[in-house]
């Protein structure tokens, strides 16, 4: 099997924002996404097309996903996202609906939420049963372009090392069905129950990734590569790597901060590969432990930062990361947005 990697300009980016529709008075979920999307897609400038869908349905009828176009700068991408969100919010308000985003809804009954009719979703729910019907979750996904397919797997591996950092920054789902779970990201624990979700396998070469996908299709694990729902993944049809570990974020400022951090990480990893350097691959047992710690403790987590087992509090390691990446951010034009990471750290994480 070959998976062609689309042409993409280095470090261009796009953002996906999953939003819940809730009653403006009670905060209860409202399963009106199909009707709302029909209205919005008939609005000038928001019609769905192959290049820029703007907004799409999701697994549940209480959710809409907003999708930016391709941008070079974080400020342009977040402005695009804000424009779309404002149009959606206006249309929703006319129905008595507000937009809501955290990693989970704090008190709703997940099982009671109707799913969106779709062959793909129906197949997933039939396969995963109880756990699939628990996926009342919302996230922010960031795509960053790569100009060479040979960079894809090393960059994915490098981003995996920073999953706990981005997860802890964004963790916003301590409550589930009205209960304080004791975790900062209940969303993380729920989503990884799917057999093709969670942390990705670590490959060095694109051909190894192609071989894995081919074998997964052969034995019926997935229908195609889009069903690899990993926390970090390469997206061949877009020529990007995608960071999917973040909980839902409530503000554009927070989205801008995690987007800038992700863009800077990818650009820095790409530059190191161009210099002939190798990307450190943490042992999978360290990667798995780091993810769990971030989900459990959020910004209070201590993470393992190298193969020797060195441990550093995230609240110390992240500021050092931001300082290290600031020259990259200045070159990319996202220094102000990257500085927003420190503001999130000072606040203890996401709103």
Predicted ranges, named:
Residues 1-95, 124, 191-351:
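C-terminal accessory/tail domains of diverse enzymes
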Residues 69-137:
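Well-ordered mid-protein domain cores that form the structural environment of catalytic cofactors
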Residues 102, 106, 119, 123-140, ...:
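Metal-dependent DNA replication initiation modules
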């Amino acid at each position: 099997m070959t998976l062609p990697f689309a042409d993409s300009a280095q470090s261009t980016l796009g953002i996906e924002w999953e939003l819940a529709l809730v009653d403006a008075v009670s905060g209860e979920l409202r399963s009106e996404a199909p009707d709302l999307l029909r209205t919005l897609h008939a609005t000038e400038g928001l019609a769905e097309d192959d290049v820029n869908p703007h907004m799409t349905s999701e697994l549940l009828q209480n959710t809409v996903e907003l999708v930016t176009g391709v941008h070079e700068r974080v400020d342009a991408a977040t402005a695009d996202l804000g424009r779309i969100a404002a149009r959606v919010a206006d249309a929703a308000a006319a129905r008595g609906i507000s937009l809501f985003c955290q990693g989970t809804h704090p008190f709703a009954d997940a099982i009671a939420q109707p799913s969106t009719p779709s062959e793909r979703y129906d197949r997933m729910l039939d396969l995963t049963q109880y756990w699939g019907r628990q996926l009342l979750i919302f996230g922010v996904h960031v795509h960053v372009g790569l100009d060479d397919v040979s960079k894809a797997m090393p960059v994915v591996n490098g981003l995996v090392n920073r999953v706990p950092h981005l997860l802890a920054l964004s963790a916003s789902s301590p409550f589930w069905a009205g209960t304080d779970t004791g975790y900062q990201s209940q969303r993380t624990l729920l989503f990884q129950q799917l057999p093709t979700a969670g942390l990705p396998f670590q490959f060095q070469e694109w051909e190894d990734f192609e071989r894995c996908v081919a074998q997964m299709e052969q034995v019926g694990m997935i229908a195609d590569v889009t069903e690899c729902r990993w926390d970090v993944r390469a997206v061949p049809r877009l020529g990007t790597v995608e960071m999917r570990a973040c909980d839902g974020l409530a503000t554009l400022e927070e989205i801008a901060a995690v987007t800038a951090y992700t863009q800077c990480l990818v650009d820095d990893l790409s530059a190191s590969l161009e210099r002939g350097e190798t990307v450190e691959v943490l042992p999978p047992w360290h990667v798995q432990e780091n993810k769990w710690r971030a989900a459990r403790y959020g910004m209070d987590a201590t993470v393992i930062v190298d193969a020797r087992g060195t441990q550093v509090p995230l609240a110390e390691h992240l500021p050092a990361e931001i300082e290290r990446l600031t020259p990259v951010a200045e070159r990319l034009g996202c220094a102000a947005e990257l500085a927003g990471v420190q503001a999130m750290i000072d606040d203890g994480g996401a709103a």
